[in-house]
Amino acid sequence: MFLDFDNCLHRCDAYVSGQDVVASEPGVALFEFAAILERELQPYPDVGIVLSTDWVGVLGFEGARDALPLASLRERVIGATRIDDCDEPASSELTHGEQIRRYVAKHRLRAWLAIDDRRDGFEPFPEQLVHCQRGVGLGDSDVQKMLARRLRLVFYVKTNWD
């Protein structure tokens, strides 16, 4: 599962102010929708998170991972697209979709989803994108339903008891 933060786990962008990362909108709590993601991922313990957020470029991998407020989400983080592309000098200029497609190809992933507020770069894989609208994020009940449905389609493993 590739994860963008801004306009996904909270309903606005964020920026660095001094030593802190703050929401661009007054009154918005960063990671306000983290518990929703935690709830939706709960039935899928083997699904890891790859950070596809610009926070990695600003705070580094550990800083971005550790910014996640829930231990259950931090423990799922297995990598970041920007780290994986660090040998590519222009990788920071690629869209999230392009970074993710490179990661998928390099690691030969067969099953994946991405939560992002941008569609660019995902054109070849529209079914893998859980698109969050800017200003709403995972707070949108329709997006939550889409996420639940796509998680089932992509990661559900049938057992002998089903």
Map each language-model feature to its residues:
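Short His-Asn-centered micro-motif
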Residues: 3, 52-58, 115-117
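C-terminal cap/substrate-recognition subdomain and adjoining C-terminal extension
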Residues: 62, 66-162
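Substrate-recognition element of Asp-dependent hydrolases with the DxDx(T/V) motif
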Residues: 44-64
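Active-site neighborhood of HAD-like aspartate-dependent phosphohydrolases
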Residues: 1-43
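Loop/helix-junction capping segments adjacent to catalytic residues or to phosphate/diphosphate-binding pockets
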Residues: 31, 58, 140
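Short, active-site-adjacent cap segments at secondary-structure transitions
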Residues: 9, 57-59, 120-122
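Acidic-and-aromatic substrate-binding clefts and catalytic sites of carbohydrate-active enzymes
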Residues: 28, 56-61, 89-90
